[in-house]
A protein has these predicted regions:
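Primarily a LysM-type cell-wall glycan-binding module
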Residues: 1-17, 82
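Acidic (E/D-rich), amphipathic helical modules within compact regulatory domains
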Residues: 12-39, 106-147
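Asparagine-centered strand-capping/turn motif at beta-strand->loop junctions
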Residues: 25, 81-86, 178-182
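Terminal connector regions
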Residues: 48-68, 126-173, 203-204, 210, ...
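Short, solvent-exposed loop/turn segments enriched in Ser/Thr/Gly
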Residues: 72-78, 170-174
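Short acidic/proline- and small/hydrophobic-mixed sequence motifs that coincide with surface turns
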Residues: 87-91, 106, 183-187, 201-202
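Hydrophobic beta-strand segments
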Residues: 94-97, 110-111, 188-193, 207
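Intrinsically disordered, low-complexity Pro/Gly/Ser/Thr-rich segments with frequent PxxP/GP/PP motifs
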Residues: 105-134, 201-229
Length: 242
């Protein structure tokens, strides 16, 4: 288990259910998995049983993908995923597809940039396609997975946020403070999501912040850069790292 992984994200990664992963690891607490834990990964269902690999996802509202090409012609995509339910969810992913110039259907899986989406919350998903100079800009999205959150999340608050844009509006420096509910909670993730005037995601990046021992708050300062066009606003989200 590496930093940032949960039973939900690991299950999605290996194409198995969370229940199967829990049964295969009866001595591991899914709500508190130490980094470095070695898990037993059960075999995925045989070919032909793919429909039963992932549980039916909890309803999630997906927005149209915002996709850009970098200097290497890779296709980088973001899309908002919103949780309409009254409880947190995790393991959210979507399958992105487009038809290439040669008639081949290209697919990539977009994963959430934080583990959990709180009740009523919105979180971007992220995917990268290999280089394709002939891509015509089209992209479809289909919900792939979303499960109830098994994690017990400690309280975290973001305050004192200040956003400074450069003259061109193509980069943003964001400062603020993370306040934890419990001292010594350790590592936190801070996600910055830049948007243009229409609310379209132009950049998103996750950073790590380490809370000093015995302290309940820590200040942060991070920079993000637009993949295309101007940044008008920046969402600042945070959660404890697993």
């Amino acid at each position: 288990v590496t930093a940032g992984e949960s039973f939900g994200t690991i299950a999605v990664k290996y194409g198995i259910t969370v229940d199967a992963l829990i049964i295969a690891n009866p001595t591991v607490n899914p709500n508190a998995i130490p980094v470095g834990t070695v898990l037993s990964i059960p075999a995925a269902p045989a070919e032909g049983d793919s429909a039963s690999v992932l549980p039916t996802p909890i309803p999630v509202t997906l927005q149209a993908p915002a996709c850009y090409q970098d200097t290497a012609w890779r296709i980088i995509c973001f899309l908002d995923s919103s949780n309409p339910s009254a409880t947190p969810i995790e393991g959210v992913s979507a399958t992105l597809r487009y038809l290439s110039a040669d008639g081949t259907l290209k697919e990539a899986v977009a994963y959430s940039l934080l583990n959990r989406i709180p009740a009523g919350g919105t979180l971007p998903l992220y995917a990268v396609f290999p280089a394709d100079k002939t891509w015509n800009g089209s992209m479809d999205a289909e919900l792939r997975s979303a499960i109830p959150s098994l994690a017990v999340s400690s309280t975290v608050e973001v305050s004192g946020t200040a956003i400074e844009l450069n003259a061109e509006g193509t980069s943003a420096r964001v400062t603020g403070k993370i306040t934890a509910g419990d001292a010594g909670a350790g590592e936190y993730w801070v996600l910055l999501v830049g948007r243009n005037g229409q609310g379209k995601i132009t950049t998103a990046r996750r950073f790590s912040v380490n809370l000093p021992a015995g302290e309940t708050s820590v200040e942060f300062a991070f920079q993000v850069y637009s993949l295309s066009g101007m940044i008008e606003t920046v969402d600042v989200l945070a959660e404890p790292a697993p």
